[in-house]
Amino acid sequence: MEFLSKIVRVHIPDYLNSVPVPDSFGGFLDLTAGQWLHLFAFSGTVAAAVYMSVKPYLDKKDQKDQLVNLRIQKESSKVVNMVDIEDLGNKVCYCRCWRSKKFPLCDGSHAKHNEDTGDNVGPLVLKRKDV
């Protein structure tokens, strides 16, 4: 614990006192190359720390894109489609990407979704067994 205390009470204040921050904007012209390097390293570290701590709150759009169903029956708490097995023909394709205009049937919208997102979703294909 003494090690941590020494870092917080001695080393960090010493480092912050050594950062060459001029008193005025004109003082930046008087900095040497070594002082500029020290200032850039300090500024970069502070910028990276601020960016990493704020980044989770910046990209709300990414959180919106994580939703699977973006527009189909949003007024319902759960989307359920019942299909009578007797109504199936020889082959039917059901959408699994939630982008189909003919939902619950697939219209191939997953191809654009896969291209845009790098996903690999495809339809659920139900086919009668050949006898």
Curated annotation (Swiss-Prot):
Stretches in topological domain Cytoplasmic: 59-131
Principal localisation: endoplasmic reticulum
InterPro entries per the UniProt record, alphabetical: CISD1/2 (IPR045131), FeS-contain_CDGSH-typ (IPR018967), FeS-contain_mitoNEET_N (IPR019610), MitoNEET_CISD (IPR042216)
Cofactor dependency: [2Fe-2S] cluster
SMART domains, sorted: ZnF_CDGSH
Annotated compartments: Endoplasmic reticulum membrane
Gene Ontology biological-process entries: autophagy of mitochondrion; regulation of autophagy
Keywords, comma-separated and alphabetical: 2Fe-2S, Endoplasmic reticulum, Iron, Iron-sulfur, Membrane, Metal-binding, Transmembrane, Transmembrane helix
Topological domains annotated Lumenal: 1-35
Origin superkingdom: Eukaryota
Record field: transmembrane: 36-58
Topological category with respect to the lipid bilayer: Single-pass membrane protein
A cellular-component GO term for this protein: endoplasmic reticulum membrane
Residues engaged in binding [2Fe-2S] cluster: 95, 97, 106, 110
GO MF terms, alphabetically ordered: 2 iron, 2 sulfur cluster binding; metal ion binding
Cofactor binding, per record: Binds 1 [2Fe-2S] cluster.
Recorded family membership: Belongs to the CISD protein family. CISD2 subfamily.
Name of the protein in question: CDGSH iron-sulfur domain-containing protein 2 homolog A
